[in-house]
Design a protein with these regions (language model features):
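Acidic (Asp/Glu)-rich catalytic clusters
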Residues: 255-259, 286-293
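Divalent metal-binding segments
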Residues: 3-9, 14, 20-282, 299, ...
Length: 361
């Protein structure tokens, strides 16, 4: 019997066979970087040699790996190469102005240290800090940077906060029509405030400010950072990026082909209301063309059934009334029932899984 390179003993071991049968044991035998056996502690003694490393798991549970079925690793590009607004400590009693000042202080540090960036991008601010009439506005960002476009995405990717320069470059003003699935927040005169809610409104900025998206190389560097600093450290072995750009998708493909992924990744094709009749046949024809073995694959259609509500308090009838919404308000559906049902049915017939963003009724 060959000796093991590594033995994990005295654990509660759970694994799965190819036929989905659960395997239980007390020890894991590892040889040449692969699991050779899962067995009891007594049997594990047979695999010990002079050069075998033995780790006592102390009765802890050992799993083969965690799968994060809804995450956004590509956001790492905005953290890695942009202004990181995550991790700013906000106290419960702080006013919106005090919160904004904290965000602006972090932004100023980034702007001052990146004088050559033609575009300032970032992510991580939280809409739930602004449930009063005071909302993030372009004038706030103008105080820090007015000569370059500033585009800050919220932590959840459902809102944008931009400065006046970004609005000018995108050609957005009071005459810009409202969108159905989202909101261009406006002041009393109808001028855009620089606050955009939900993807359809956000795309007015993203699609019209040159250089908004990160490059393929920036995404590759960012995912390698995410992979080593987060996924590998916390036992995540598979991630599904549930909203990503074409550049991010290409970054995954290249990393997989280069053999640099230690985390399996899955992407999505985004199906939009009103356009699914043209989009879905394209996705069906493309299915499999982006796949790289088991390391990267796109076999999921993503649908936004509605938007997102970020609050510090429950979504009650009292809250609805206080915020001027009609009694019984349940949000705004992005799809009619017939189109939504057909898009799901046709996607599944084509062999796709369907991933639906839905937070309400």
């Amino acid at each position: 019997m060959a000796t093991a390179d590594l033995i994990l003993k005295n654990g509660k071991i759970f694994s799965v066979k190819d036929d989905n049968t659960i395997i239980r044991g007390e020890a894991v035998i590892i040889k040449d970087g692969k699991i050779d056996n899962i067995c009891g502690n007594d049997e594990a003694l047979k695999y010990e040699g002079n050069n075998t490393e033995v780790i006592d798991c102390g009765g802890n549970t050992i799993l083969p790996g965690l799968c994060d079925a809804h995450c956004h690793p590509s956001i790492a590009a905005a953290v890695y190469a942009g202004c990181d607004l995550f991790g700013i400590y906000i106290q419960e009693n702080e006013t919106p102005d005090e919160v904004i000042d904290k965000y602006l202080a972090r932004l100023k540090d980034f702007v001052d240290s990146h004088p050559d960036n033609a575009l300032i991008r970032g992510t991580g601010w939280v809409q739930g800090n602004f449930i009063t009439d005071r909302k993030p506005a372009r004038q706030d960002l103008d105080r820090i940077c007015s000569d370059r476009p500033v585009i800050l995405e919220s932590f959840c990717q459902h809102s944008l906060w931009v400065n006046t320069k970004a609005l000018e470059i995108a050609g957005i003003d009071k005459d810009t029509p409202d969108v159905y699935a989202g909101e261009i927040v406006r002041d009393e005169q109808g001028n855009p405030t620089g606050y955009f809610k939900e993807p359809e409104a956000m795309d007015l900025i993203k699609m019209n400010v040159p250089g908004y998206d990160f490059s393929v190389e920036e995404y590759k560097d960012a995912f390698l950072f995410y992979q080593s600093e987060f996924a590998n450290k916390y036992g995540v072995t598979l991630v599904q990026d549930c909203m990503h750009s074409d550049n991010a998708r290409e970054a995954y493909v290249q990393l997989a082909k280069e053999g640099k992924l230690t985390v399996r990744a899955r992407g999505v094709y985004m199906l939009e209301p009103g356009a699914f009749g043209e989009q879905l046949p394209q996705f069906i024809n493309r299915k499999g063309s982006d796949d790289v073995g088991k390391d990267f694959r796109i076999d999921t259609i993503k649908i936004f059934a509605e938007g997102m509500f970020v609050l510090k308090e429950p979504f009650t009838e009292e809250f609805i009334s206080e915020n001027g919404m009609p009694k019984g308000y349940r949000g705004t559906p992005y799809w009619n029932d017939e189109d939504l049902g057909k898009s799901i049915e046709d996607s599944m017939k084509a062999g796709f899984d369907v991933h639906i963003h839905a937070m309400g009724d």
